[in-house]
């Protein structure tokens, strides 16, 4: 079967030039409010300036079931600092003002509390491109599907190596912008080796759709970025960027982002 996308994606103008350049897009994640709100916003702007094609802006949540220890510690610190959802929307505005493209990554509960349509409206008004919802499945996403149509936002759902063919097709059909491929089973975090399950998962998506596929959960080096960029449309980096910011501040964050941006281009140079 082939899954067709129902509407044009906001993110297509980002992925298409990357495909033309024979490279993957670099997608960088940071949580709002770590180590504090102003620094987190500066850090996200630094991602844009250092070569990130898309910035994932995290909404800290008190029960982050899929986050590894690095991100969990950072989000806990942000929550202790009093971060609010409106701070995430302000970060999206700052990224947009810097010429970047932002998507928000959030567990579903904060969106429900804010109001699904109100969140979509305010995210679009801030210049956001879409929403990644790691704990929301399309079957339970009726309100979000409707709100994303009303406000012109992309919706990024997750697929995993364990996804059945039926679940994969349903998820891909509901997604717009890109599909987030979790390259390992379990929680996120930087790893020395990249999962061998990821290329197979990307292939399974491509058998049924031409929607871009972003691979996350583990990248922390130029070499790994180049490796994943060899088969994925997007290389997603989270824990390694959070660690760089926490350990070395904006200088270390910029250096790692530039290294990763070189990594996704390395494959293009070699091909």
Swiss-Prot record:
SUPFAM superfamilies: Ribulose-phoshate binding barrel
EC top class named in words: lyase
EC numbers on record: 4.2.1.20
InterPro entries: Aldolase_TIM, RibuloseP-bd_barrel, Trp_synthase_alpha_AS, Trp_synthase_suA
Example of a GO cellular component annotation carried by this entry: cytosol
Record's keyword terms, sorted: Amino-acid biosynthesis, Aromatic amino acid biosynthesis, Lyase, Tryptophan biosynthesis
Reactions this protein catalyses: (1S,2R)-1-C-(indol-3-yl)glycerol 3-phosphate + L-serine = D-glyceraldehyde 3-phosphate + L-tryptophan + H2O
Pathway annotation: Amino-acid biosynthesis; L-tryptophan biosynthesis; L-tryptophan from chorismate: step 5/5
One MF annotation (Gene Ontology) recorded for this entry: tryptophan synthase activity
Active site residues of this protein: 56, 67
Subunit structure: Tetramer of two alpha and two beta chains.
Function: The alpha subunit is responsible for the aldol cleavage of indoleglycerol phosphate to indole and glyceraldehyde 3-phosphate.
Family from the record: Belongs to the TrpA family.
PANTHER family: TRYPTOPHAN SYNTHASE ALPHA CHAIN, CHLOROPLASTIC, TRYPTOPHAN SYNTHASE, ALPHA CHAIN
Name assigned to this protein: Tryptophan synthase alpha chain
Biological source species: Mycolicibacterium paratuberculosis (strain ATCC BAA-968 / K-10) (Mycobacterium paratuberculosis)
């Amino acid at each position: 079967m082939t899954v067709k996308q129902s509407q044009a994606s906001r993110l297509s103008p980002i992925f298409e030039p990357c495909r033309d350049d024979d490279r993957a897009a670099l997608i960088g994640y940071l949580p709002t409010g770590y180590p504090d709100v102003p620094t987190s916003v500066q850090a996200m702007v630094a991602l844009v300036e250092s070569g990130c094609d898309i910035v994932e802006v995290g909404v800290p949540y008190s029960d982050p079931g899929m986050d590894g220890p690095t991100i969990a510690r950072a989000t806990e610190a942000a929550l202790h600092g009093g971060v609010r959802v409106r701070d995430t929307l302000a970060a999206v505005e700052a990224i947009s003002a810097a010429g970047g493209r932002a998507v928000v990554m959030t567990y579903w509960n904060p969106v429900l509390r804010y109001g699904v349509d109100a969140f979509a409206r305010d995210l679009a008004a801030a210049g956001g491109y879409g929403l990644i919802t790691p704990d929301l499945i399309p079957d339970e996403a009726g309100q979000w599907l409707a709100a994303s149509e009303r406000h012109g936002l992309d919706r990024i759902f997750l697929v995993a190596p364990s996804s059945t063919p039926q679940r994969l097709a349903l998820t891909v059909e509901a997604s717009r912008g890109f599909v987030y491929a979790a390259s390992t089973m379990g929680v996120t975090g930087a790893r020395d080796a990249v999962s061998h399950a990821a290329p197979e998962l990307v292939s399974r998506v491509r058998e049924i759709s031409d929607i871009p596929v972003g691979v996350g959960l583990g990248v922390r080096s130029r070499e790994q970025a180049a490796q994943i960029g060899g088969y994925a449309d997007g290389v997603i980096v989270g824990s390694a960027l959070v660690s760089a910011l926490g350990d070395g501040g904006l200088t270390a964050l910029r250096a790692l982002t530039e290294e990763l941006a070189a990594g996704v281009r390395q494959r293009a140079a070699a091909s």
